[in-house]
Amino acid sequence: MTRVLQTERKESLSGSTRSAVVFLHGYGANAADLLGLADPLGEHLPDTLFIAPNAPEICNGIPMGFQWFPIPWIDESSEEESMRGMQAAVEDLNAFLDAL
């Protein structure tokens, strides 16, 4: 079962969306970290929707951030937990992209 990703978005400047840019943040960050790039990029891509999902899991050790999957050498999770988390994140992102 896929998890629904919470997103932040910036609509196209023209009001007519013909393309989309999806920003994926890194470990411990959140959607807002990258969505600010929409302003300078939007001037050059006026028909583009900019969207940034938050990763589905709260980041261990960084309570205001999110993670797509655990990273063993950072959070002491196991390789198995990391691989399961990565596969779940891939499924979540595929469902998210299919719904755009």
Predicted stretch roles:
Residues 2-100:
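Serine-hydrolase catalytic machinery in alpha/beta-hydrolase-like enzymes
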